[in-house]
Amino acid sequence: MTISPNKKIYFASDQHFGAPTPEASFPREQKFVAWLEEVKKDAECIFLLGDLFDFWFEYKTVVPRGFVRVLGKLAEIRDSGIPIYFFVGNHDLWMDDYFEKELNIPVYHNNQEYEFNGKTFLIGHGDGKGPGDKGYKRMKKVFTSSFSKWIYRWLHPDIGVKLAQYLSVKNKLISGDADVKFLGEENEWLVLYAKRKLETKHFNYLIFGHRHLPMVLKVGENAQYINLGDWISYFTYGVFDGEKFELKEY
Protein backbone atom coordinates (compact mmCIF):
# COMPACT_ATOMS: atom_id res chain seq x y z
CA MET A 1 0.00 0.00 0.00
CA THR A 2 1.22 3.48 -0.86
CA ILE A 3 0.44 6.24 1.63
CA SER A 4 -1.26 9.28 0.11
CA PRO A 5 0.77 12.52 -0.04
CA ASN A 6 0.86 14.39 3.29
CA LYS A 7 -0.85 11.51 5.07
CA LYS A 8 0.39 9.48 8.05
CA ILE A 9 -0.34 6.20 9.79
CA TYR A 10 -0.98 6.40 13.53
CA PHE A 11 -0.60 3.75 16.23
CA ALA A 12 -1.74 3.67 19.87
CA SER A 13 -2.17 1.01 22.54
CA ASP A 14 -3.04 0.22 26.15
CA GLN A 15 -5.47 2.93 27.13
CA HIS A 16 -7.22 0.70 29.70
CA PHE A 17 -10.25 2.94 29.90
CA GLY A 18 -12.37 2.19 32.93
CA ALA A 19 -9.37 1.62 35.22
CA PRO A 20 -8.96 2.01 38.09
CA THR A 21 -12.51 3.45 38.13
CA PRO A 22 -14.67 5.00 35.41
CA GLU A 23 -14.43 8.37 37.17
CA ALA A 24 -10.64 8.30 37.38
CA SER A 25 -10.41 7.10 33.79
CA PHE A 26 -12.59 9.85 32.34
CA PRO A 27 -9.85 12.54 31.95
CA ARG A 28 -7.72 10.03 30.05
CA GLU A 29 -10.66 9.26 27.78
CA GLN A 30 -11.07 12.97 27.07
CA LYS A 31 -7.38 13.26 26.23
CA PHE A 32 -7.55 10.30 23.87
CA VAL A 33 -10.61 11.71 22.12
CA ALA A 34 -8.73 14.99 21.66
CA TRP A 35 -5.82 13.05 20.14
CA LEU A 36 -8.16 11.25 17.75
CA GLU A 37 -9.67 14.58 16.72
CA GLU A 38 -6.18 15.91 16.00
CA VAL A 39 -4.78 12.96 14.06
CA LYS A 40 -7.86 12.48 11.88
CA LYS A 41 -6.80 15.60 9.97
CA ASP A 42 -3.96 13.77 8.22
CA ALA A 43 -4.51 10.09 9.05
CA GLU A 44 -4.23 7.57 6.25
CA CYS A 45 -5.35 4.98 8.80
CA ILE A 46 -5.21 4.31 12.54
CA PHE A 47 -4.05 1.16 14.32
CA LEU A 48 -5.24 0.46 17.88
CA LEU A 49 -3.16 -2.33 19.35
CA GLY A 50 -5.32 -3.60 22.17
CA ASP A 51 -6.43 -3.00 25.75
CA LEU A 52 -8.43 0.03 24.72
CA PHE A 53 -10.68 -0.96 27.60
CA ASP A 54 -9.64 -2.41 30.92
CA PHE A 55 -12.45 -4.89 30.46
CA TRP A 56 -14.74 -5.69 27.55
CA PHE A 57 -17.22 -8.49 27.13
CA GLU A 58 -20.00 -8.79 24.58
CA TYR A 59 -23.17 -10.48 25.65
CA LYS A 60 -25.62 -11.17 22.84
CA THR A 61 -27.62 -8.01 23.61
CA VAL A 62 -25.38 -6.07 26.03
CA VAL A 63 -21.96 -4.40 25.97
CA PRO A 64 -20.23 -2.68 28.92
CA ARG A 65 -21.59 0.68 29.99
CA GLY A 66 -19.54 3.81 29.33
CA PHE A 67 -16.87 4.90 26.83
CA VAL A 68 -19.50 6.77 24.81
CA ARG A 69 -17.19 9.59 23.73
CA VAL A 70 -14.44 7.20 22.65
CA LEU A 71 -16.82 4.98 20.70
CA GLY A 72 -18.55 8.01 19.18
CA LYS A 73 -15.26 9.51 17.99
CA LEU A 74 -14.15 6.19 16.50
CA ALA A 75 -17.48 5.92 14.68
CA GLU A 76 -17.14 9.48 13.40
CA ILE A 77 -13.63 8.87 12.07
CA ARG A 78 -14.62 5.59 10.48
CA ASP A 79 -17.71 7.16 8.88
CA SER A 80 -15.46 9.82 7.36
CA GLY A 81 -13.70 7.07 5.40
CA ILE A 82 -10.52 6.71 7.46
CA PRO A 83 -9.72 3.02 8.12
CA ILE A 84 -9.25 1.92 11.73
CA TYR A 85 -7.79 -1.48 12.63
CA PHE A 86 -8.25 -2.97 16.09
CA PHE A 87 -6.11 -5.69 17.67
CA VAL A 88 -7.46 -7.27 20.83
CA GLY A 89 -5.31 -7.26 23.94
CA ASN A 90 -5.40 -9.42 27.03
CA HIS A 91 -8.05 -7.17 28.62
CA ASP A 92 -10.41 -7.02 25.66
CA LEU A 93 -9.71 -10.49 24.29
CA TRP A 94 -13.41 -11.34 24.54
CA MET A 95 -14.23 -8.79 21.86
CA ASP A 96 -16.49 -10.37 19.26
CA ASP A 97 -18.29 -8.57 16.42
CA TYR A 98 -19.60 -5.37 18.05
CA PHE A 99 -16.84 -3.18 16.59
CA GLU A 100 -17.23 -4.74 13.16
CA LYS A 101 -21.02 -4.45 13.03
CA GLU A 102 -21.56 -1.13 14.81
CA LEU A 103 -18.37 0.79 13.94
CA ASN A 104 -17.20 -0.96 10.77
CA ILE A 105 -13.82 -1.53 12.41
CA PRO A 106 -12.17 -4.91 11.72
CA VAL A 107 -10.97 -6.78 14.79
CA TYR A 108 -7.88 -8.99 14.80
CA HIS A 109 -6.98 -11.62 17.38
CA ASN A 110 -3.55 -12.40 15.93
CA ASN A 111 -0.56 -10.54 14.51
CA GLN A 112 -0.91 -9.12 11.01
CA GLU A 113 1.66 -8.23 8.36
CA TYR A 114 1.53 -5.07 6.24
CA GLU A 115 3.60 -3.17 3.72
CA PHE A 116 3.46 0.61 3.46
CA ASN A 117 5.64 2.55 1.04
CA GLY A 118 7.96 -0.42 0.69
CA LYS A 119 8.42 -0.82 4.46
CA THR A 120 7.25 -4.04 6.08
CA PHE A 121 5.38 -4.16 9.39
CA LEU A 122 4.49 -6.88 11.89
CA ILE A 123 1.74 -5.60 14.17
CA GLY A 124 -0.06 -7.04 17.21
CA HIS A 125 -0.80 -6.52 20.89
CA GLY A 126 2.05 -8.71 22.08
CA ASP A 127 0.58 -10.69 24.96
CA GLY A 128 1.74 -14.28 25.26
CA LYS A 129 4.57 -13.86 22.77
CA GLY A 130 8.16 -14.88 23.25
CA PRO A 131 9.62 -17.28 25.82
CA GLY A 132 8.33 -17.52 29.37
CA ASP A 133 4.98 -16.39 30.80
CA LYS A 134 3.73 -19.96 30.45
CA GLY A 135 1.09 -19.46 33.12
CA TYR A 136 -0.53 -16.65 31.18
CA LYS A 137 -0.36 -18.61 27.93
CA ARG A 138 -2.24 -21.49 29.54
CA MET A 139 -4.74 -19.10 31.08
CA LYS A 140 -5.34 -17.38 27.74
CA LYS A 141 -6.21 -20.68 26.10
CA VAL A 142 -8.79 -21.30 28.81
CA PHE A 143 -10.25 -17.78 28.71
CA THR A 144 -10.58 -17.69 24.94
CA SER A 145 -12.30 -21.05 24.69
CA SER A 146 -15.92 -21.04 23.57
CA PHE A 147 -16.84 -22.91 26.75
CA SER A 148 -15.41 -20.18 29.01
CA LYS A 149 -17.28 -17.48 27.11
CA TRP A 150 -20.48 -19.50 27.30
CA ILE A 151 -20.11 -19.91 31.07
CA TYR A 152 -19.34 -16.21 31.59
CA ARG A 153 -22.43 -15.17 29.65
CA TRP A 154 -24.53 -16.81 32.34
CA LEU A 155 -23.28 -14.24 34.86
CA HIS A 156 -25.47 -11.18 35.13
CA PRO A 157 -23.57 -8.24 33.53
CA ASP A 158 -23.58 -6.32 36.83
CA ILE A 159 -21.75 -9.23 38.45
CA GLY A 160 -19.48 -10.13 35.54
CA VAL A 161 -18.25 -6.59 34.91
CA LYS A 162 -17.71 -5.85 38.62
CA LEU A 163 -15.73 -9.06 39.02
CA ALA A 164 -13.50 -8.24 36.06
CA GLN A 165 -12.94 -4.67 37.27
CA TYR A 166 -11.94 -5.92 40.72
CA LEU A 167 -9.39 -8.34 39.29
CA SER A 168 -7.93 -5.69 36.98
CA VAL A 169 -7.38 -3.20 39.79
CA LYS A 170 -5.34 -5.84 41.61
CA ASN A 171 -2.92 -5.90 38.68
CA LYS A 172 -0.25 -3.24 39.32
CA LEU A 173 0.73 -3.16 35.66
CA ILE A 174 -2.78 -2.08 34.76
CA SER A 175 -3.27 0.34 37.64
CA GLY A 176 -0.28 2.30 36.39
CA ASP A 177 2.08 1.87 39.34
CA ALA A 178 5.61 2.94 38.55
CA ASP A 179 7.08 -0.57 38.75
CA VAL A 180 7.26 -1.29 35.04
CA LYS A 181 10.96 -1.24 34.25
CA PHE A 182 13.06 -2.13 31.25
CA LEU A 183 14.56 -5.54 31.92
CA GLY A 184 17.31 -5.44 29.31
CA GLU A 185 17.09 -6.82 25.80
CA GLU A 186 18.03 -10.32 26.94
CA ASN A 187 15.07 -10.42 29.35
CA GLU A 188 12.37 -8.58 27.42
CA TRP A 189 10.14 -11.32 26.01
CA LEU A 190 8.79 -9.21 23.16
CA VAL A 191 12.28 -8.15 22.12
CA LEU A 192 13.32 -11.81 22.03
CA TYR A 193 10.16 -12.64 20.09
CA ALA A 194 10.93 -9.91 17.55
CA LYS A 195 14.46 -11.18 17.04
CA ARG A 196 13.19 -14.72 16.58
CA LYS A 197 10.66 -13.60 13.97
CA LEU A 198 13.43 -11.86 12.06
CA GLU A 199 15.28 -15.16 11.75
CA THR A 200 12.65 -16.40 9.29
CA LYS A 201 11.33 -13.19 7.72
CA HIS A 202 12.50 -9.59 7.61
CA PHE A 203 10.39 -6.72 8.89
CA ASN A 204 11.37 -3.08 9.08
CA TYR A 205 9.08 -2.45 12.04
CA LEU A 206 7.75 -4.90 14.64
CA ILE A 207 5.16 -2.92 16.58
CA PHE A 208 3.46 -4.07 19.78
CA GLY A 209 1.75 -2.83 22.93
CA HIS A 210 1.16 -4.80 26.15
CA ARG A 211 4.47 -3.90 27.83
CA HIS A 212 3.41 -0.34 28.82
CA LEU A 213 6.93 0.94 28.16
CA PRO A 214 7.71 3.20 25.19
CA MET A 215 10.60 1.58 23.33
CA VAL A 216 12.34 1.84 20.00
CA LEU A 217 15.15 -0.71 19.72
CA LYS A 218 17.25 -1.87 16.81
CA VAL A 219 16.83 -5.64 16.58
CA GLY A 220 18.38 -6.31 13.18
CA GLU A 221 19.58 -4.76 9.96
CA ASN A 222 17.03 -2.06 9.11
CA ALA A 223 14.70 -3.59 11.71
CA GLN A 224 13.23 -1.93 14.79
CA TYR A 225 11.21 -3.31 17.69
CA ILE A 226 8.72 -0.70 18.86
CA ASN A 227 6.57 -0.74 21.95
CA LEU A 228 3.91 1.96 21.96
CA GLY A 229 3.87 2.55 25.72
CA ASP A 230 0.47 3.38 27.18
CA TRP A 231 -2.14 6.04 27.91
CA ILE A 232 -1.87 5.63 31.67
CA SER A 233 1.58 7.01 32.43
CA TYR A 234 3.18 7.96 29.11
CA PHE A 235 0.45 8.98 26.63
CA THR A 236 2.65 7.90 23.75
CA TYR A 237 1.74 7.00 20.19
CA GLY A 238 3.48 6.01 16.99
CA VAL A 239 3.41 7.74 13.63
CA PHE A 240 4.74 6.60 10.25
CA ASP A 241 4.98 9.35 7.64
CA GLY A 242 5.82 7.07 4.73
CA GLU A 243 9.56 7.27 5.28
CA LYS A 244 10.28 6.90 8.99
CA PHE A 245 8.59 5.83 12.22
CA GLU A 246 8.55 8.03 15.32
CA LEU A 247 7.30 7.52 18.86
CA LYS A 248 5.76 10.70 20.24
CA GLU A 249 4.09 11.92 23.42
CA TYR A 250 0.72 13.66 23.41
Question: What are these language model-derived features?
Answer:
Residues 2-8, 12, 17-116, 233:
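Core catalytic region of metal-dependent phosphoesterases/phosphodiesterases
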Residues 7, 119, 223:
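Nucleotide donor/acceptor-binding cores
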Residues 31-35, 68-71, 108-110, 130, ...:
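Short, surface-exposed linear patches
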Residues 54-77, 176-203:
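N-terminal short leaders/motifs
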Residues 106-109, 122, 127, 133-139, ...:
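Conserved beta-sheet core of the metallophosphoesterase superfamily
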Residues 116-117, 241:
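Structural motif
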Residues 126-189:
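Active-site-proximal loop/helix segment associated with metal-binding centers of metalloenzymes
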